[in-house]
């Protein structure tokens, strides 16, 4: 990132109770710090890699976000590749915290 002030507000939110029905992310989506109409996108990091550097970036719900082309460009610049989740039949896109914002029109990845 460049030094200096960001051109936008940046919010880092840690939510809880995903397994209990997305309670934390639903609460934030209903009570956002910045109106959702002004929210340009979000990144959900649900599980972090503890095994070291990898070449792939796994997208949950491939094809469901207009942020994917940007992610693909950034990944390519790092010598990485974007891949879809290995088991889409599990419906993880609809059971993860990003869905609370995505269903309200916020581009999420």
Question: Can you name each region flagged by the protein language model?
Answer:
Residues 1-7:
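Flexible, small-residue-rich helix->loop connector segments that border functional cores
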Residues 5, 15-109:
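Metal-dependent peptidase/peptidase-like ectodomains
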């Amino acid at each position: 990132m460049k030094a200096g002030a960001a051109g936008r507000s940046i919010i880092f939110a840690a939510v809880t109770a995903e397994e209990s029905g997305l309670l934390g992310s639903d609460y934030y989506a209903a009570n956002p710090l910045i109106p959702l109409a002004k929210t340009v996108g979000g990144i959900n990091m649900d599980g972090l890699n503890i095994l070291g550097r990898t070449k792939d970036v796994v997208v949950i719900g491939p094809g469901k976000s207009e942020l994917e082309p940007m992610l693909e460009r950034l990944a390519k610049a790092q010598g990485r590749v974007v891949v879809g989740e290995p088991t889409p039949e599990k419906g993880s896109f609809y059971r993860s915290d990003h869905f609370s914002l995505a269903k309200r029109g916020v581009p999420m990845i």
